[in-house]
A protein has these predicted regions:
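N-terminal secretory signal peptides that target proteins for export/translocation
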Residues: 1-9
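Bacterial N-terminal signal peptides
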Residues: 13-23
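Non-catalytic accessory segments of hydrolases
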Residues: 28-186, 207, 301
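Substrate-access "cap/lid" subdomains that shape
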Residues: 98, 198, 232, 241-315
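Alpha/beta-hydrolase active-site loop
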Residues: 109, 179-201, 258
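Alpha/beta-hydrolase-fold catalytic nucleophile elbow
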Residues: 161, 213, 228, 239-242
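Alpha/beta-hydrolase fold nucleophile elbow
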Residues: 204-215
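Short glycine-enriched nucleophile-adjacent loop
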Residues: 219-230
Length: 315
């Protein structure tokens, strides 16, 4: 028979053991509630589990197109130290207020998201790369939940942001003289596809089985990548959902160049040599608001800043 003091000591020991067990259980749960850290060429990235899908969000696939990189082809992303937090989406690209998207003036927006089904085996899964729509003026990858698709298709799904509006499609004479593409948003998409080709295997995807798909402007983008020599070898299958190349004939190269020069003048940058440097110094919000639709619409959709045949990205 134990004494009251002994019984009290035993109760304390029991509570201690139960507490330790709870801590161990919580630690084990924490370990399985997050997907493994992935080591990319840029650095390590963590993610989160969403309904049984591994999600790695807000991964930069190109350098921020700001300052001197505004209206330049996408450049490689910088490396980072430590582990990057991949639990939240990156910023949406600069765009005016629309029925679907809030206004944004953020140019540091070249991010992608990777979704992979939990419980993958050793075999690599096919890859699907999603290009959002929005008339090349609005939208973002964050508007689409790819968790269910990754599970049902048993595929690694990637969704991407790309430059929009006058940040993604314009024809400035000084850029034309430098043989810079007028289709920077399309080049962003190509940069994302190159990232997929070199990095997606680390997330369990098969870089030799990439399907490019999109809707509306995203579908038109898919069509253009099917004919662009710069996109050759970056994907292997394509799905187009409501949107085709012929939608882009609304803005001929000459008209695009004229409206780009006009945009510069609206920003206080005189036509001629030096206009490009002046335009690069203007705040993103000013560029965006001076380039919003002004009666230049087809069936209610602005077609002012869409891809054009520049002989570089679009033949």
């Amino acid at each position: 028979m134990t004494s009251p003091r002994t019984r009290q000591a035993l109760r304390h020991i029991s509570f201690f053991i139960m507490g330790c067990a709870g801590m161990i259980s919580a630690h084990a749960h924490a370990q399985i509630s997050a997907p493994p850290i992935v080591q990319t060429s840029q650095g390590a990235v963590s993610g989160k589990l969403i309904s049984g899908t591994r999600a790695y969000l807000g991964i930069p696939y190109a350098a921020p197109p700001v300052g001197e990189l505004r209206w330049q082809s996408p450049q490689p992303p910088a490396r980072w130290s430590g582990t990057r937090d991949g639990s939240a989406f990156g910023a949406r690209c600069a765009q005016p207020l629309s029925a679907l998207s809030p206004e944004s003036a953020n140019e540091d927006c070249l991010f992608l998201n990777v979704y992979a089904p939990e419980g993958m085996g050793r075999n690599k899964l096919p890859v699907m790369v999603w290009i959002h729509g929005g008339a090349f003026l609005s939208g973002s990858a964050a508007e689409y939940d790819m968790t269910k698709l990754a599970q049902k298709a048993q595929a690694v799904v990637v969704s991407i942001n790309y430059r929009l509006g006058a940040f993604g499609s314009l024809r400035q004479p000084e850029l034309v003289a430098q043989s810079t593409s007028s289709n920077l948003g399309l080049q962003d998409q190509q940069a994302a596809l190159r990232w997929v080709g070199s990095q997606i295997g680390k997330f369990g995807g098969d870089a030799s089985r990439v399907t490019l798909f999109g809707h509306s402007a995203g579908s038109a983008s898919v069509c253009l990548h099917m004919v662009s020599p710069q996109s050759k070898g970056l994907f292997h299958r394509a799905i187009m959902q409501s949107g085709a190349c012929h939608l882009l004939t609304a803005t001929p190269p000459a008209a695009m160049q004229a409206q780009t020069v006009s945009l510069g003048v609206k920003l206080g940058c005189p036509e001629g040599r030096g206009q490009l440097a002046c335009m690069r110094q203007k705040p993103a919000a000013d560029v965006m608001r001076q380039s919003v639709p002004n009666g230049n619409e087809v069936n209610g959709v602005d077609i002012r800043w869409t891809p054009v045949q520049d002989g570089i990205t679009v033949p």
